[in-house]
Amino acid sequence: FDIADEAKKIGIPFEGHLPVTVTAEDASRAGQKSFEHLIGILPASSSRSEELFQAAQVEFAEELRTHGRFDELHDSKLGEEMLDTYSPRRVEELSAVFKSNGTWQCPTFTLLHMFAYGDDPALQSDPRVKYMPPRVVAGWHPDELDGKRSPQDFAFAKKEFQRDLEVVGAMQKAGVGILAGTDTQNPYTFYGFSLHDELGFLVQAGLSPIEALQAATLNPARFFGKDKDLGTIEKGKLADLVLLDANPLDDIANTRKINAVVYRGNLYARPALDAMLAKVQALAARPLIGKVLFKTIQEQGIDAAVTQYRELKTKHPDDYDCSEDEFIGLGYGLIHIKNFKGAIEIFKLAVEAYPQSYNTYDSLAEAYMDNGDKDLAIRNYQKSIEINPGNANGIAMLKKLNSQ
């Protein structure tokens, strides 16, 4: 609550995840402007919400003691009781508190659906995967989701998802502000496409098509206090528009039937949009430079890999995925197998390619430290902090090195 008090003093709104140690009502009264992912909402919607809250505190302490983390209540033994004691009356009471305090809800159904249906082969074979980098999709397999969830976990999450839909529909009817969010970069939240998925889930929850559209347009404008400039199509407002071939008020799925986009005064007709999608698909299909270089390191050594990278960048500058993540992932992979000198050379390439990224210097510093080169480790941690004064890891490691 100290954060809430300080935010009030300096006039900064705060929002985010509901902490497990705070009730939904208390967070709302303290001024939390929005809740993300409906965290804590279903337990608060139980006729035994107080008992569940207290039991969760005990479980929270035990999980921290034994595992160093706490999975949400929906993953605990209290989950079934939470669903069995769901109370529409409690939802009405919660909604009244939220409406009175101006507390919004951002369900991110696209994310919640992934947790519930991540084991569904249809989801895994979604054709939109072709627009995603392979290194991102690699972590989307059910065995990789949320700590290797069991079939029982997925079965429970499916029941929970249906209840989440019901809760949001009830809150909308009660006048609670709803925001369309997607938490993009999580599994199966496809860039751009996921907002259309979210609109569909909002309608499934009971919102009308116009209410779902407002959750993605007018409501965010109001939430940020920008409704004088954004949120509706009116004279004098910013004219960033999506032009459709069919009416979304008849069927929310019609938001996908895009004819053109107007953005910052530029018109992008369907052929231009299709060309953009084709480019994204081509970029996503590029070979990963990390995988290419690792093979060379294994077969010929780090010097050959560095030479190979420079040749590829000269002769085929756009044909490989040379994102920062590729260098960082490869470098830490080399650290993992204790090839510290190799990691240093890879992180040097990362610094060369991304000189304004604090993380490249932070990673290079770690490799130097692991290799026993304290002075160069300090120098690079200092550079990372120079770029990002809030780099907590760099600050901590620099303090540790300077004390040795």
Residue ranges of each PLM-predicted region?
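Helix-start (N-cap) detector for alpha-helical repeat units in TPR-like alpha-solenoids
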Residues: 324, 340, 358-359, 392-393
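Residue-level recognition of tetratricopeptide repeat
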Residues: 200-201, 332, 366, 400
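Acidic, glycine-enriched loop/beta-strand segments at the rims
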Residues: 190, 208-213, 222-258
